[in-house]
Amino acid sequence: RNLILATFGNDEALEILPLVDGLPNAPTDPPVISLVSAEHDQIDGFIAFSPVFPVSGSGVCGYILAPLAVLPAHQRQGIGSLLIKHGLTSLAERNADLVLVYGNPHYYGRFGFEGAIPEAFQPPFEMAYPAAWQGLLLDGGTMPRTPVSFKPVPALNNSALW
């Protein structure tokens, strides 16, 4: 909680904290994957990947990256990059097809996320910043022939987060 409060402004943190609190208790199959970075017994980074569930039964195994948080004093040191790379590797090993993210295109583009991919994956809510909706196909992942609607885990099923 302290990490989220320190990383995000108060208003944004108040929207994100229920997500962070709800993810560990999400009874999902496949499971939510959470990773932390710590230095001197202090958590300085956190990332979560939660599964998405296609409404149409397309068989796509996808995840959403949310949230990513790094203490402000520890940013620009590669912690976020390491968390993302480790998470993507873990998801590929679990045979996930794709990862979606709603975030800064310049930042996430460094890891291969593209704006064209999520055109095939419709978010559950209207987004304030549609250009921030991005996706990354993992090894073996393919684009569906028709757009796929999906449902996120309950903690992420909140229009304020979109």
What do the predicted segments below correspond to?
Residues 7, 90, 107:
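Short alpha-helical functional segments enriched in proximate histidine and acidic residues
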Residues 34-36, 41-53, 62-69:
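Conserved beta-strand in the GNAT
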Residues 20-25, 119-123:
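Short, solvent-exposed loop/turn elements at beta->coil junctions and helix N-caps
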Residues 42, 71-82, 93-94, 110-111:
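Conserved glycine-rich acetyl-CoA-binding loop
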Residues 1-22, 28-43, 133-134, 139-141, ...:
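Short amphipathic alpha-helix that is part of the acyltransferase structural core
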Residues 93-97, 102-128:
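Conserved active-site alpha-helix within GNAT-family acetyltransferase domains
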Residues 49-50, 83-87, 115-120:
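Short acidic (Asp/Glu) patches
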Residues 65, 70, 76-89, 101:
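Conserved acetyl-CoA-binding loop-helix of GNAT-fold acetyltransferases
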